[in-house]
């Protein structure tokens, strides 16, 4: 790793650091369109939230990390409000996989779940081909373009976001770019309930599966 002292970090300071950088980015770009990807370390292991969040949740460090993540999102929302961008900013909150509780760190995450089921009604978790590993939550907020208070079970894939966001801003993707990304802006905005015909998925052990709106086939 290069960079000397500037390349060093403490896990408990990651949330504060990336949140501050994100707020500065919003401030510096408030007068022009921008795309910002905010990839938080919460609740990824090792889970080591800042001291001011420890003990805030009965689920131990994992719960505290979720509280810390909630704080980061709140700070970004406040920044958008402060700079007059809240009404015209499309916000997508999601995950890159299903939940994992015990990932090799002795932080008592399993013991302190207190009846909470991170994958909801689904079987499996992050590494699995079952829905618990591949079905992820998506929250979309855009005061100018999304009617709130609704839920959707429409089938789409995160790979569709590239084509969908290009569709939103009127951009044409170069030929051969993201050929498996479908423009499904209506699904994101809640104006179209037509699902994708199918999605190909793969687990960490390279097990392939095909998901349709009604069925899921996992290779034997």
Predicted feature locations:
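C-terminal cap/loop subdomain of S1 sulfatases and analogous C-terminal strand-loop tails that border
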Residues: 99-129, 146-220
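Loop/turn elements at helix/coil->beta-strand transitions in domains of secreted/extracellular proteins
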Residues: 29-36, 85-91, 135-136, 194-197, ...
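Active-site-proximal beta-strand/loop segments in catalytic clefts of secreted hydrolases
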Residues: 38-43, 48-51, 94-97, 134, ...
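Solvent-exposed, polar/charged alpha-helical surfaces in well-ordered, non-transmembrane soluble domains
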Residues: 20-24, 67, 71-74, 78, ...
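Active-site His/acidic residue clusters
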Residues: 22-64, 100-102, 106-109
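Soluble non-cytosolic domains of exported or imported proteins
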Residues: 9-17, 60-67, 152-159, 178
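Short glycine/proline- and acidic residue-enriched helix-loop micro-motifs
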Residues: 1-10
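Metal-dependent active-site segment of extracytoplasmic phospho-/sulfohydrolases and closely related
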Residues: 69-106
């Amino acid at each position: 790793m290069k960079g000397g002292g500037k390349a060093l970090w403490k896990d408990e300071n990651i949330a504060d650091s990336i949140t501050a950088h994100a707020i500065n980015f919003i401030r510096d770009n408030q007068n022009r369109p921008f795309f910002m990807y905010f990839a938080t370390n919460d609740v990824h292991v090792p889970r080591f939230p800042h001291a001011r969040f420890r003990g805030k949740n009965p689920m131990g460090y994992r719960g505290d990390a979720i509280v810390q993540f909630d704080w980061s999102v709140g700070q970004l929302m406040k920044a958008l409000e402060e700079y007059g961008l809240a009404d015209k900013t499309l916000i997508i909150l999601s995950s890159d996989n299903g939940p994992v509780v015990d990932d090799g760190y002795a932080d008592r995450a399993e013991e302190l779940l207190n009846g909470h089921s991170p994958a909801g009604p689904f079987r499996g978790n992050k590494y699995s081909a079952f829905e618990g590993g591949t079905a992820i939550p998506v929250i979309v907020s855009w005061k100018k373009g999304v009617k709130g208070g609704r839920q959707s079970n429409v089938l789409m894939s995160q790979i569709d976001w590239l084509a969908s966001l290009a569709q939103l801003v009127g951009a044409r993707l170069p030929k051969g770019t993201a050929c498996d990304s479908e423009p499904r802006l209506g699904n994101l905005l809640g104006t179209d309930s037509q699902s994708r015909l199918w999605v190909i998925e793969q687990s960490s052990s390279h097990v392939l599966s095909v998901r349709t709106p009604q069925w899921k086939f996992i290779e034997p």
